[in-house]
């Protein structure tokens, strides 16, 4: 119901990108229970259910219950950042490359033919929801789930994070061996500009086969307040550097 963020977006640990194209409200609700302002959407919703108990005679007693909820949604799309633990791992590199590919609308060749970037599999981006029925035909009207209310578009996310390995994300995606070589070639330049922040490393909580790649560490191998403060500092600096909401 609201546009994507219009600010330029990118990656906190290097790299940059372009925000998703702003979109207009797809629909408006005309109801005494819904109020629009320039800043918010306020709505009232009555949740109805039935509480059932059994009396002394063993008979069920059904009592209707109503609970009134007041909802308020900000119409301004915030500038949102995501910091991934294990940014240089299989998941971190794949998510980052996927966002880059979608942001740029990339296509690449595979052995099954040409593929294009999409968000299939995402509940928010890849599904629809029923808005209602057509007042004339009675046909269902379905809309993209992400247009139901103001939501951050994944193309607008600012990505950062930590990893025990200091490889840049281009080298890390090669190590992960998840992405098609043709796709990797298209995002390699941007991925090479991104490097994870140093991470805490507690060997007892990480698989032993990861030890050889642990070259990007915050000093210390045991939990401490110093580690907590460093992570907090990283988050504060990430938010400030990228002007996040």
Task: Give residue spans per PLM region.
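Metallocofactor- and cofactor-centric catalytic cores in central/energy metabolism, strongly enriched
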Residues: 2-245
